[in-house]
Amino acid sequence: MAFKIATPQIRFASPGPQPNGLQAAPDGLWCIDQVDNKIYRQDFETGEVLFEAQTDTVHSSGITLGGGYIWIASTYESKIAKLDLVTGKTVAKYDSPGAGVVAWREDAVDAQSTGAHGLEWRGGLLYVASPPSQMIHVMNPENWTEVNRFPSGGLRVHGIAWGPRGRLWVSDTSSGTVQLMETEHGRIFETIRVEAPAEVHGMTIYEDVLWYCDAHSQQIGCLIV
């Protein structure tokens, strides 16, 4: 079969009103909220909030950890923010690669330029999912140059998470899918359809299980395949 079907299993509610980005780490589940723009770190089992901090990001849609920092996609200012891991204070901000008007808003009179959604880190590089460009941009954070890009495989890319063999899980909220892609050209190896009404906004992987957050329902859960 060319696809699988995932059943969302709700684990707990996010402490913020609209969770929009997730990152699993040994010390807990990190989340960025797009309304209060706070970062939260929760216990995987209970959902207990272990840490929270207010950020100066705007309508944020992605979070990851790497190089000793927190990275956040500050979507509505088209920036990628680099934050102190202990305090949550912004250290620097960089232009979001692929920023622009998303395809489904191009003809709207009030169309607004926006930036990235999901983020991931590997090998000293930052992987940035951009709905406006419909690409995954691979950035060198040392000099903020793009070293590669590949198609995201859909209309509205959102969360991303590392899969097996160095491949990347990529969610698309317009099609309700999660696809496993290689990171040079974007070749797709697997597609998972996510049962409605859940939408995979933020996404991460913990103990070989994909976790997601849904900004519409405020829920955080797992995808059971």
PLM features: residue spans?
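Conserved beta-strand positions in repeat-built beta-propeller and related beta-rich domains
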Residues: 15, 31-36, 72-78, 128-133, ...
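Beta-rich, blade/repeat-based domains predominating
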Residues: 13-26, 56-67, 97-123, 153-165, ...
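Blade-level signature of beta-propeller repeat domains, shared across WD40, Kelch, NHL, RCC1
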Residues: 200-225
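Blade/loop signatures of beta-propeller domains
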Residues: 1-5
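A short beta-strand motif characteristic of beta-propeller blades
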Residues: 7-13, 48-53, 89-94, 99-109, ...
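Short loop/turn segments that connect beta-strands within beta-propeller blades
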Residues: 43-47, 84-88, 140-144, 182-186, ...
